[in-house]
């Protein structure tokens, strides 16, 4: 510590604070200390980091660490009103509390707070890392918040962001879709179809469609391919396009993200599950009669906390050169929208 202090021209206490990422040390000084530490071959003691985490978890120390919980949704109240976001947050809070961290919530689209001001608030509160939750229709973070990602370790939940690309935790949508196909086939369905908005699929790099198509390839190698129905916006205005697709494709079970498809089928004269089955790609407790895949978004929230805490312990800050992805396996849930025997 003394050698680093001498090389950087600061006190040993400043070195200690800088290497812990303390907000009490300016970003410029912290960077200088880190350069000197690296030049002198300094490495962090992983055992000490684990000890501090355990002390925070058990309450044996009064250290009160805090993470920022950043609402990236355009709706300020999405954390309370959206059907799935509260599940991510519940998992994140549970894991953060276990590790001794509090969560302070901020809205990224608040017109009264610039990126620079938010960064200043995080420093003042001693916040050293951030969780980004709420990206649903885009994988782009607000440009005016660029300084946040450049200074603080941050992990996104649900989707992989672009420009910048940050580390993220999310459901494994490819294996989810393939597993759903496997389950449908094992039950007895032989003509599974997919109802999905291409905007959503593009957001997750086509992983839902990829899993579905590989399922077709594996289980229907000689059968005619059933093309996904993607005209969601049009069907919401006029069901004729959906009805035409059903008549043409003749699916016996549908995979989808949209509960309204149940109403569409009823209006088209189908009895569920007698005439056709329904499997939800994102099963929700609010519609527990559906069969589907529980994405375990609570575990995604937990994984995001683990990832950002690991980054803090290892002194990782800023936009990563090699972002890390943590994917959570989904769980099959039985329901009344399918019938045994297909």
Residue locations for each model-derived region?
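N-terminal helix-turn-helix DNA-binding module of bacterial transcription factors
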Residues: 1-57
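Amphipathic helical "hinge" segments at domain boundaries
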Residues: 2, 40-119, 128, 198, ...
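Periplasmic-binding protein-like
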Residues: 68-69, 126-135, 155, 191-198, ...
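Short beta-strand elements in bilobed, periplasmic/extracellular small-molecule ligand-binding domains
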Residues: 93-109, 164, 192-195, 206-239, ...
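Flexible loop/hinge segments that line or gate small-molecule binding clefts
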Residues: 133-176, 280-291
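Hydrophobic alpha-helical segments within soluble ligand-binding/sensing domains
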Residues: 167-194, 235-243, 295-316
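An alpha-beta-alpha
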Residues: 180-219, 318-339
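Flexible loop/turn connectors
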Residues: 244-342
